[in-house]
UniProtKB/Swiss-Prot annotation:
Organism: Zymomonas mobilis subsp. mobilis (strain ATCC 31821 / ZM4 / CP4)
Protein name per UniProt: Integration host factor subunit alpha
A single cellular component GO annotation: cytosol
Isomerase among keywords: no
Keywords, ordered alphabetically: DNA recombination, DNA-binding, Transcription, Transcription regulation, Translation regulation
């Protein structure tokens, strides 16, 4: 990631809720933590998460495969695993393109 690109943090989102919605800082932080907790719990249970107009968090199972050590060239088995991917919605993609 490039150093000159800013990052939106939990604290930033909490501050936005405080200023724009009028919630207290404590309530804003609690709301963010609860929302992220619900998303995390759903993903832990193996559920995909779809937020309309934003995107989807999708769990994918990767099968075992053979990889190669780039330094030695020796083949190495890569264990099966579950990965989390994010796919932005079409609306989000359009908003990003228009904003660029």
């Amino acid at each position: 990631m490039q150093a000159d690109i800013p990052t939106l943090t939990r604290a930033d989102i909490t501050d936005m809720l405080y200023h724009e919605v009028g919630l207290s800082r404590a309530d804003s932080a609690k709301m963010i933590e609860q929302m992220l907790g619900h998303i995390t719990d759903a993903l832990k249970k193996g559920e995909n998460v779809k937020i309309s107009g934003f995107g989807s968090f999708i769990l994918r199972d990767k099968n075992e495969r053979v990889g190669r050590n780039p330094k030695t060239g020796i083949e190495v088995p890569i264990a099966p695993r579950r990965v989390l991917t994010f796919r932005a919605s079409q609306l989000m993609r359009q908003r990003i393109i228009k904003g660029a």
